[in-house]
Amino acid sequence: MNRNPDHNTLPNITLKIIETYLGRLPSVNEYYMLKLQTRNIQKITVFNKDIFVSLVKKNKKRFFSDVDTSASEIKDRILSYFSKQTQTYNIGKLFTIIELQSVLVTTYTDILGVLTIKAPNVISSKISYNVTSMEELARDMLNSMNVAVIDKAKVMGRHNVSSLVKNVNKLMEEYLRRHNKSCICYGSYSLYLINPNIRYGDIDILQTNSRTFLIDLAFLIKFITGNNIILSKIPYLRNYMVIKDENDNHIIDSFNIRQDTMNVVPKIFIDNIYIVDPTFQLLNMIKMFSQIDRLEDLSKDPEKFNARMATMLEYVRYTHGIVFDGKRNNMPMKCIIDENNRIVTVTTKDYFSFKKCLAYLDENVLSSDILDLNADTSCDFESVTNSVYLIHDNIMYTYFSNTILLSDKGKVHEISARGLCAHILLYQMLTSGEYKQCLSDLLNSMMNRDKIPIYSHTERDKKPGRHGFINIEKDIIVF
């Protein structure tokens, strides 16, 4: 039986486009499955591969100069990938190839190719901070929280780091400057821009086009190194993707957020790069200390945390005029846990217009209760807070994604109480609400504290879902 389509019954232009792309006459099945992809296929077919090769070579020279590969090898890898469809007969794989090639031909130049042209002048905007003056205070605060007991029998997952991280970091520094409306950074690198004594590994980023950027970067690395690069999506980390090499070594990761979320994230401008406001980052750190795993990290490397904490404390002292005199007033706010229903009630009336906050430890339960309230004014800040917030009838409803530490049976540990207070303050900052007095009291409540042992802790909310991935070598997309 003839598997080829009848030339007399098919639109000649569409058939010709598909035939040119595949390098062969398509089967009937291939034709009917691919004809809706004609526009993308056309873009791929007319794409100037020579210019693309030149851009990749320039990226290699600027950011990957120490990688031992020749210009001819790069060209061969690129041309091989753009002709891969001619040797592929599986429809699913053909769709994957078309999708990934389409991303490259429509976005690479604007996203990564632009990094090879002359950059705008860097606007120096650094302020001299006296971080040293905060080191002793930070050490005292962290010492009182260094209460985790490490279980030596616990098997920790290894986080293998690729040797390419330093190259990608160099690229990311330029990327953050060129794309500072759609990509901002946080974490150690952002604090390094304030305090050069901070050590950092990879660069932590939030952006509005994460998937496209990571696909383009994955191909750049593949074409330069020849390695198989895999993009993975983790179900319990919202809108998160990571690039790893074929040996499962971590290269870079990214959280994707909507543009409207990006617009409200507090940020500051340093050397043409936007970083998440260190005040906001400090609140996030205080919140994360409620997570038992983070306290275990603190016990393993307290000096790393001390450098970060001191930097952020100095920033808030300088920026907001915070006085560290130990006056904490009503901080941390009173917290009562309902362990059966997994809800913590925080008394907020001393600081805010809403009288209390109900912090749910199960996101699905919160979503259900919000529906029952028939309220449609909730704020979802995605991975920025990993939470939804709703204020209804003078009550805040929110999701708290970390563990709750207990200092005794039924008693919330002060570390978690401060974490919950910080979580509420994140909302205040994101919505331009009042937070400075509360921030001052919260930070002062961390001074001169004795260590309080952890009695127990709640479990984190279990997130459903499966891992997704893009395997470039095997032409597979699973999401």
Curated annotation (Swiss-Prot):
<feature type="active site">
    <location>
        <position position="202"/>
    </location>
</feature>
<feature type="binding site">
    <location>
        <position position="202"/>
    </location>
    <ligand>
        <name>Ca(2+) 2</name>
    </ligand>
</feature>
<dbReference type="GO" id="GO:1990817">
    <property type="term" value="F:poly(A) RNA polymerase activity"/>
</dbReference>
<dbReference type="InterPro" id="IPR024398">
    <property type="entry name" value="Poxvirus_polyA_pol_cat_N"/>
</dbReference>
<comment type="function">
    <text>Polymerase that creates the 3'-poly(A) tail of mRNA's.</text>
</comment>
<comment type="similarity">
    <text>Belongs to the poxviridae poly(A) polymerase catalytic subunit family.</text>
</comment>
<protein>
    <recommendedName>
        <fullName>Poly(A) polymerase catalytic subunit</fullName>
        <ecNumber>2.7.7.19</ecNumber>
    </recommendedName>
</protein>
<dbReference type="GO" id="GO:0005524">
    <property type="term" value="F:ATP binding"/>
</dbReference>
<keyword id="KW-0067">ATP-binding</keyword>
<keyword id="KW-0547">Nucleotide-binding</keyword>
<keyword id="KW-0808">Transferase</keyword>
<feature type="binding site">
    <location>
        <position position="253"/>
    </location>
    <ligand>
        <name>Ca(2+) 2</name>
    </ligand>
</feature>
<dbReference type="GO" id="GO:0046872">
    <property type="term" value="F:metal ion binding"/>
</dbReference>
<dbReference type="Pfam" id="PF03296">
    <property type="entry name" value="Pox_polyA_pol"/>
</dbReference>
<feature type="binding site">
    <location>
        <position position="204"/>
    </location>
    <ligand>
        <name>Ca(2+) 1</name>
    </ligand>
</feature>
<feature type="active site">
    <location>
        <position position="204"/>
    </location>
</feature>
<dbReference type="InterPro" id="IPR038419">
    <property type="entry name" value="PolyA_pol_nucTrfase_sf_Poxvir"/>
</dbReference>
<dbReference type="GO" id="GO:0006397">
    <property type="term" value="P:mRNA processing"/>
</dbReference>
<dbReference type="InterPro" id="IPR004976">
    <property type="entry name" value="PolyA_pol_cat_Poxvir"/>
</dbReference>
<keyword id="KW-0106">Calcium</keyword>
<dbReference type="Pfam" id="PF12630">
    <property type="entry name" value="Pox_polyA_pol_N"/>
</dbReference>
<dbReference type="InterPro" id="IPR024397">
    <property type="entry name" value="Poxvirus_polyA_pol_cat_C"/>
</dbReference>
<feature type="binding site">
    <location>
        <position position="202"/>
    </location>
    <ligand>
        <name>Ca(2+) 1</name>
    </ligand>
</feature>
<keyword id="KW-0507">mRNA processing</keyword>
<keyword id="KW-0479">Metal-binding</keyword>
<dbReference type="InterPro" id="IPR024231">
    <property type="entry name" value="PolyA_pol_nucTrfase_Poxvir"/>
</dbReference>
<keyword id="KW-0804">Transcription</keyword>
<dbReference type="InterPro" id="IPR038337">
    <property type="entry name" value="Poxvirus_polyA_pol_cat_N_sf"/>
</dbReference>
<feature type="binding site">
    <location>
        <position position="204"/>
    </location>
    <ligand>
        <name>Ca(2+) 2</name>
    </ligand>
</feature>
<dbReference type="InterPro" id="IPR037265">
    <property type="entry name" value="PolyA_pol_cat_sf"/>
</dbReference>
<dbReference type="Pfam" id="PF12629">
    <property type="entry name" value="Pox_polyA_pol_C"/>
</dbReference>
<keyword id="KW-0244">Early protein</keyword>
<comment type="subunit">
    <text>Heterodimer of a large (catalytic) subunit and a small (regulatory) subunit.</text>
</comment>
